[in-house]
């Protein structure tokens, strides 16, 4: 693994990539002069995702701030794939690693601010728990459900994350996005064309912040609802395991976990992966599972559910990278 800091290289920005040589003739994906973030070649990703499995990113970029991110994407070869990585839930990183560039947003993108009109402005790197708690302290209701979703606002916006009867589209006003090429745009919620666990955000777009609409509320009542959400999650889900969250989308009028259970998959194993005994719509890494174990188990569950009920389950967990 090689970490490049901009001061390590004397080079000129010609607008073409690559121009820098890194150890072993590995070329940096952009001219790095003036880039202030951290750029790492062959960066292990397993430690950054909840399943604790998977390969490395060809490149991992951790921008110093918004301007740094815009500069980086403006210089990046448009043919290279770009993926934003949040908290690492809802994600399988395949064992062969991720091509192109993975972008990890840090503290500069994790702020949360409340406003007198009961709106909340939050960075894409802010955790759902922080957003809900900050809103509670300001007497802003309507965001309690985010307490029960593992992830960051950037991921919530991209996939229309939801829980306990509420979804991101119910509270999102708009979001700020850096597009491939480095342009900065604000997209109103209508432009995202939300459906169940899906948005129309273009590939390679990086959400950097979002504005959410709440409503007046009593902090004590809001706090009690957040505690209820947290307790419900603790009681029903394997939250203290290496898991990725809900594995399959709920088919219309049905619950995925019931279909999985009816097909006899509770406790089913493949390699070091297992269908949770506690909640059958969760896969868990119980014994050094590879990502191939986890994804393979999910595919086997899909096969058995279809054979039993005729319903074809759809993955909710994102699966990225090379096998």
From Swiss-Prot:
Keywords: Cell cycle, Cell division, Cell shape, Cell wall biogenesis/degradation, Cytoplasm, FAD, Flavoprotein, NADP, Oxidoreductase, Peptidoglycan synthesis
EC identifiers of the protein: 1.3.1.98
Molecular function terms, GO-annotated: FAD binding; UDP-N-acetylmuramate dehydrogenase activity
Composition bias, Polar residues: 235-249
GO cellular component, one term: cytosol
Intracellular or extracellular location(s): Cytoplasm
Pfam family, one: FAD_binding_4
GO biological process: cell division; cell wall organization; peptidoglycan biosynthetic process; regulation of cell shape
InterPro entries: FAD-bd_PCMH, FAD-bd_PCMH-like_sf, FAD-bd_PCMH_sub1, FAD-bd_PCMH_sub2, MurB, MurB_C, MurB_C_sf, Oxid_FAD_bind_N
Domain FAD-binding PCMH-type span(s) in chain numbering: 52-217
Cofactor or coenzyme needed: FAD
Catalytic activity line of the entry: UDP-N-acetyl-alpha-D-muramate + NADP(+) = UDP-N-acetyl-3-O-(1-carboxyvinyl)-alpha-D-glucosamine + NADPH + H(+)
Superkingdom as given in the UniProt entry: Bacteria
Residues of the active site: 197, 246, 316
Pathway: Cell wall biogenesis; peptidoglycan biosynthesis
Similarity comment text for this entry: Belongs to the MurB family.
PANTHER family attached to this UniProt entry: UDP-N-ACETYLENOLPYRUVOYLGLUCOSAMINE REDUCTASE
Free-text function comment from the UniProt entry: Cell wall formation.
Protein name from the UniProt record: UDP-N-acetylenolpyruvoylglucosamine reductase
Organism, as annotated: Erythrobacter litoralis (strain HTCC2594)
């Amino acid at each position: 693994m090689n970490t490049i800091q901009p001061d390590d290289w004397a080079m000129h920005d010609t607008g073409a990539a690559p121009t820098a040589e890194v150890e072993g003739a590995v070329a940096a994906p952009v001219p790095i002069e003036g880039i202030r973030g951290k750029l790492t070649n062959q960066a292990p990703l397993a430690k950054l995702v909840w399943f604790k499995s998977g390969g490395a990113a060809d490149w991992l970029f951790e921008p110093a701030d918004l301007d740094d991110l815009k500069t980086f994407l403006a210089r990046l070869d448009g043919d290279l794939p770009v993926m934003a990585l949040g908290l690492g839930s809802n994600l399988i990183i395949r064992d062969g690693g991720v091509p192109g560039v993975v972008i990890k947003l840090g503290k500069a993108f994790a702020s949360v601010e409340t406003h007198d009109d009961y709106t909340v402005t939050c960075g894409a790197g802010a955790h759902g728990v922080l957003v809900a708690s900050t809103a509670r302290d300001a007497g802003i209701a309507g965001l309690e459900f985010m307490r029960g979703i593992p992830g960051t606002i950037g991921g919530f916006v991209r996939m229309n994350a939801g829980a306990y009867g509420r979804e991101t589209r119910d509270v999102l006003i708009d979001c700020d996005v850096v597009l491939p090429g480095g342009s900065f745009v604000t997209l109103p919620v209508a432009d995202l064309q939300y459906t169940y666990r899906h948005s129309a955000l273009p590939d390679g777009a990086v959400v950097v912040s979002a504005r959410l609409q709440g409503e007046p509320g009593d902090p004590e009542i809001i706090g009690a609802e957040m505690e209820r959400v947290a307790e419900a999650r603790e009681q029903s889900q394997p939250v203290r395991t290496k898991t990725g969250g809900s594995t399959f989308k709920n088919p219309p009028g049905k619950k995925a976990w019931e279909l999985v259970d009816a097909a006899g998959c509770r406790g089913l194993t493949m390699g070091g992966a297992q269908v949770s005994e506690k909640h059958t719509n969760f896969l868990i890494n119980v014994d050094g599972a590879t990502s191939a174990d986890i994804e393979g188990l999910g595919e086997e569950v899909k096969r058995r559910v279809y054979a039993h009920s005729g319903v074809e389950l759809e993955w909710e967990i994102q699966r990225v990278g090379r096998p």
